[in-house]
Amino acid sequence: MSAAATAGKLGRAPADPGKAPGVAAPGASTAAPPAKEIPEVLVDPRSRRRYLRGRFLGKGGFAKCFEISDADTKEVFAGKIVPKSLLLKPHQKEKMSMEISIHRSLAHQHVVGFHGFFEDNDFVFVVLELCRRRSLLELHKRRKALTEPEARYYLRQIVLGCQYLHGNRVIHRDLKLGNLFLNEDLEVKIGDFGLATKVEYDGERKKTLCGTPNYIAPEVLSKKGHSFEVDVWSIGCIMYTLLVGKPPFETSCLKETYLRIKNNEYSIPKHINPVASSLIKKMLQPDPTARPTIHELLNDEFFTSGYIPARLPITCLTIPPRFSIAPSSLDPSNRKPLTVLNKGMENPMPERPREKEEPVVREASEPVDCHLSDMLQQLHSVNASKPSERGLVRQEEAEDPACIPIFWVSKWVDYSDKYGLGYQLCDNSVGVLFNDSTRLILYSDGDSLQYIERDGSESYLTVSSHPNSLIKKITLLKYFRNYMSEHLLKAGANITPREGDELARLPYLRTWFRTRSAIILHLSNGCVQINFFQDHTKLILCPLMAAVTYIDEKRDFRTYRLSLLEEYGCSKELASRLRYARAMVDKLLSSRSAANRLKASS
């Protein structure tokens, strides 16, 4: 049996690309880089706590963000670091002071944790909760429209966090997907208090607002004075975006967008549940006094009558969950008991999904080529810019860790002369693409199975309970798993299942081929992975994030935005691999077209 294994491990990190996780980066990004080097060890002079600076997480404005760990307790945080040389103007200092002042006064399950701040002669350091699963912005880029139960799950937590803010007289004023962070348990954490303000007395209307919020309310645009209602408007925009897949007033021109907001010009697609449409319309009332208050929202029928999962699996970040086997939110028989269960309870009580096999219907919005055309266009664009032929190449400026892939192939074994290709994903699940074009995946819990027919329909089974027709394939899958455990990786204990995993669906291997130089693997979530045989370098391309992850000979794992590589350039090594990737994606598209022509003629 021939075999080869990929390498590269990766821990996830917080935040929005282009800013620190949980707080705004003040100022504009055009400023010159600071002359001073950020120290490897950050020392809080008051508490004498020492933090070790770790992996780079993102940048934006004047700030850079790193993973930092307490030298004594080993506890890990996100450290936002701002050079004082870029905080020279009084309003810049004042803005940062206000942001810190508001954020440090807050402590809630759905607000990014604030763990302190300090400074030395050159930098201001802010210590924040680490949100390893980034933000709803990255989720939106990968998934576009979510299922209704997922939207309900996230919105409920956003509302709870915002209830706490309003209860403490804080208006956030910039609620948007990129400021709603996710921890390892996919809990929402409201962050970035750079535009937040505190209401000093009842009835106070704020007149000024610096910056340009994404989901700006009409009363802010008209400068008539605004208050807590602007956050409810923003949540209406967020709800629309989560369910429809794009913001309600979005255009390519800012002026046109603002005109649409002023005229309340938006439309809700017909396929959206009327109960959801009704709540969106209530929150997007042009008259702020006509909107529900933050404390009224969770009593709306959208929340009281629909299925709310208690937890969601990590797979939801890239693949829709298994709600085809969960109760429909539109099923009247499910409404009454759920209403009763949700009333007065701190946490929603999920309805147990029916335990039965049921194929998942592929979403209509999914492109036929699984985003290969988009990827080809992105690669054509970056290659045409000749990124390695620059006088000054600044590849590090193109790095964007927020675009790190959720899944990639960590091991593979080719036994296609008899059975198929076996592979392991980075979460330790194992799959086989059989020669008959069916797929079988064993989850990391060692028992759950996902079977994908040739037509893409999916069934969910277990090792202990499955039809006789799958006995041979399950036996082969176990054989592949054992081979990879013994030869290609350190054998590890089974992972303990977590709540929400019963809703998980994993991406699967759509197709693959080998050349003399590499193996090319195309996953169902759109990612293409290329493992080069000679030097063991790897590329993972994601068309939805428009990003590439490059794993070099030293197993160094770095993720870049393709548009930024066009701007800042890259090394000759990466450029040659991107040219190769374009040819391979072209080949994937050509073979897909040929297969479709064959199907049509048969």
Swiss-Prot record:
Role, per record: Serine/threonine-protein kinase that performs several important functions throughout M phase of the cell cycle, including the regulation of centrosome maturation and spindle assembly, the removal of cohesins from chromosome arms, the inactivation of anaphase-promoting complex/cyclosome (APC/C) inhibitors, and the regulation of mitotic exit and cytokinesis. Polo-like kinase proteins act by binding and phosphorylating proteins that are already phosphorylated on a specific motif recognized by the POLO box domains.
Annotated region described as Disordered, given as residue ranges: 1-32, 336-362
Chain intervals for the UniProt region annotation (Important for interaction with phosphorylated proteins): 536-538
Enzyme active site: 174 (proton acceptor)
EC number: 2.7.11.21
Region of interest (Activation loop), ranges: 192-219
Keyword presence, Flavoprotein: no
Gene this chain is encoded by: PLK1
Sequence ranges of Basic and acidic residues compositional bias: 349-362
Domain notes: The POLO box domains act as phosphopeptide-binding module that recognizes and binds serine-[phosphothreonine/phosphoserine]-(proline/X) motifs. PLK1 recognizes and binds docking proteins that are already phosphorylated on these motifs, and then phosphorylates them. PLK1 can also create its own docking sites by mediating phosphorylation of serine-[phosphothreonine/phosphoserine]-(proline/X) motifs subsequently recognized by the POLO box domains.
Covalent link (Glycyl lysine isopeptide (Lys-Gly) (interchain with G-Cter in SUMO2)) residue numbers: 336
Residue ranges constituting the POLO box domain according to the UniProt record: 408-486, 508-590
Regulation of this protein's activity per its record: Activated by phosphorylation of Thr-208 by AURKA; phosphorylation by AURKA is enhanced by BORA. Once activated, activity is stimulated by binding target proteins. Binding of target proteins has no effect on the non-activated kinase. Several inhibitors targeting PLKs are currently in development and are under investigation in a growing number of clinical trials, such as BI 2536, an ATP-competitive PLK1 inhibitor or BI 6727, a dihydropteridinone that specifically inhibits the catalytic activity of PLK1.
Cross-link (Glycyl lysine isopeptide (Lys-Gly) (interchain with G-Cter in ubiquitin)): 19, 490
Linker, as annotated region: 491-505
Phosphothreonine PTM positions: 6, 208, 212, 496
Catalytic reaction list: L-seryl-[protein] + ATP = O-phospho-L-seryl-[protein] + ADP + H(+); L-threonyl-[protein] + ATP = O-phospho-L-threonyl-[protein] + ADP + H(+)
Sequence motif D-box that targets the protein for proteasomal degradation in anaphase, residues: 335-338
Chain positions with N-acetylserine modification: 2
Residue span, Protein kinase domain: 51-303
Family annotation (SMART domains): S_TKc (SM00220)
Residues where ATP binds: 57-65, 80, 129, 176-179, 192
Cellular location(s): Nucleus; Chromosome, Centromere, Kinetochore; Cytoplasm, Cytoskeleton, Microtubule organizing center, Centrosome; Cytoplasm, Cytoskeleton, Spindle
MF term (GO), any: protein serine kinase activity
Gene3D superfamilies, per database record: Phosphorylase Kinase, domain 1, POLO box domain, Transferase(Phosphotransferase) domain 1
Protein name: Serine/threonine-protein kinase PLK1
An example Gene Ontology CC term for this record: cytoplasm
